[in-house]
Structure formats: C-alpha cells, structure tokens
Amino acid sequence: MKLEVLPLDQKTFSAYGDVIETQERDFFHINNGLVERYHDLAKVEVLEQDRTLISINRAQPAAMPIVVHELERHPLGTQAFVPMNGEAFVVIVALGDDKPDLSTLRAFISNGRQGVNYHRNVWHHPLFAWQTVTDFLTVDRGGSDNCDVESIPTHELCFA
C-alpha cells in the first residue's frame, strides 16, 4: 500500500501532537529585548514518579524506498524531536487504543525548521533521518519501560 507524505502543519497534525516551530507563533521579548521567546510550544507530559530527559539522537537516513511495517507508542509520556541541523524529516503517525487504527495512518514531512511532540499513546514510526545523518534534540521521559510496538501491513511512502 502507498502512504502519501503531506507537509507538516499544526492543523493537520494536531490529533497526533504538537508542531514545534516559530512560524506564525506568538512571542515576547526577554533579556532586555535581545531575545524573542516563543513560549510553551508543546506540552511535555510524564508521570509523577518519572523525570523529563533531554537527549540528542543521531539518526541515520532510511533506505529508499521508505517502507513502514511497524509502529510504536509511549503510554507513560510524550516524546519530542527537533532537528538540530535544519534537515527536513519524515514522521509517520496513527491513532488507536490497543493497536494502531490504520484509517488514521498519516505521514508528514517537516520543513527542517519544525520539530514534533507526540502526544502520549500516539502510534508513530521509530525515528529516522530522511536524506542525511541528522541530530535531533529529544525530550522524553526517564523511568521504567515505556514502549509498545505493533506490526502493521507494509506501506511504502509516496512523496508528492
């Protein structure tokens, strides 16, 4: 099956999480007017007994064509990825309770200046780079195991 890759924007991505970007977002000045602060762009969630982690993930490019055959989710916290070197990247997401609901399966491509924050329990493809090795600032939770993985029928990404 083919899965069309759509441009990433907050309106079409909102059911799955937050788009982290400055374009068309409100800000206020800090540090004597030298800094524009784009405040509270994503809601980070972790359970009380856990803690929030900030990491850097170095992702390798996926082999072409990109084929999706499994999704994962994190029921105990959100997970955010922001590319650090301006590279576009692809995210694949689906809603669903115990298993991914394939009628909600979507793929998006960022513009290289956007990150994503997956809501708790949103099914998504494991992180990968699109065209070149990419470092991602990653914000997620530390604590016990927090990853459910499900196989899905194979889908090949289709770039418009």
From Swiss-Prot:
One Pfam match, given by its short name, reads: Ureidogly_lyase
The EC number of this protein is: 4.3.2.3
Pathway linked to the protein: Nitrogen metabolism; (S)-allantoin degradation
Q: Which Gene3D superfamilies match?
A: Ureidoglycolate hydrolase (2.60.120.480)
GO biological process per UniProt: allantoin catabolic process; purine nucleobase catabolic process
Task: Describe the function of this protein.
Answer: Catalyzes the catabolism of the allantoin degradation intermediate (S)-ureidoglycolate, generating urea and glyoxylate. Involved in the utilization of allantoin as nitrogen source.
The family classification in the record reads: Belongs to the ureidoglycolate lyase family.
Q: How does it assemble?
A: Homodimer.
**NCBIfam families noted in UniProt:** PRK03606.1-1, PRK13395.1
**What name is this protein filed under?**
Ureidoglycolate lyase
Q: Which organism is it from?
A: Salmonella paratyphi B (strain ATCC BAA-1250 / SPB7)
